[in-house]
Regions:
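Acidic, glycine-rich loop-and-beta core segments that form the ion-binding/anion-interacting portion
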Residues: 165, 178-191
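Short, hydrophobic beta-strand segments
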Residues: 56-62, 166-173
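Short, conserved phosphate-binding/catalytic loop or strand-edge motifs used
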Residues: 96, 160-168
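Charge-rich, low-complexity amphipathic helices
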Residues: 101, 105, 165, 169-170
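ATP/Mg2+-dependent ligation/transfer catalytic cores
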Residues: 1-156, 178-184
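Histidine-centered active-site/metal-ligand motif
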Residues: 158-159, 172
């Protein structure tokens, strides 16, 4: 939509939802709106939705119509243009590490690993164990199904050293495309 907007302050929030101490220096005290422009190349299905649903990544623009300098996608595009000016094209293969946790509805409760198919929680390190990954086979299979439906180029999944800590590797490819895929993957894993 032409009138899609977000407040600039979203770009200076921390991972906890707080604002940086230099908020006003970065986006100004008025907290103006950015204009959002959808990138049709990022359109993907939402396979877990009960009704047919799509998702799309937007580029952020200032009120003057310029790419917003703080939007992470725009920062990456600037870096890629620097590479292009040198005649280079970066090829990347992201690795995303994350923890599986038991569903938790009370934010006061401690996060714990989920119960595996054996009926037990992990209690010790299971670095690179195939059996440890297999404990979570239902969620792993669903993850691969969701990734395939969204055309995410995921490859190898391994168990890392922490309790229920996983690492997924993406296939090598275009930096912007894979950054978008990682963004979608993170949302997918939260579902």
């Amino acid at each position: 939509k032409e009138d899609s907007r977000l407040p600039e302050s979203i770009l200076v929030q921390t991972v906890t939802g707080d604002y940086t101490k230099i908020h006003d220096q970065l986006v100004g005290p008025m907290d103006g709106d950015m204009m959002l422009q959808p990138d049709p190349d990022t359109m993907r299905l939402v396979p877990w939705a009960s009704d047919p649903t799509g998702q799309i990544i937007h580029d952020c623009y200032t009120r003057d119509g310029e790419l917003h300098p703080l939007a992470s996608r725009n920062v990456l595009k600037r870096v890629l243009r620097l590479y292009e000016a040198e005649g280079w094209k970066p090829v990347v293969a992201p690795e995303v590490e994350y923890y599986l946790i038991q569903k938790n509805v009370d934010p006061e409760d401690e996060l714990v690993p989920p119960i595996g198919r054996s009926g037990r929680r992990e209690a010790g390190r299971q670095s690179y164990s195939i059996d440890a990954v297999n404990e979570f086979e239902p969620i792993v299979e669903e993850m691969y199904d969701f990734c395939e439906a969204q055309e995410l180029d995921v490859d190898t999944l391994i168990h890392e050293s922490g309790l229920a800590q996983m690492e997924i590797n993406f296939l090598h490819g275009d930096a912007l495309n894979l950054a978008d895929q990682v963004f979608v993957f993170k949302r997918t894993m939260r579902e």
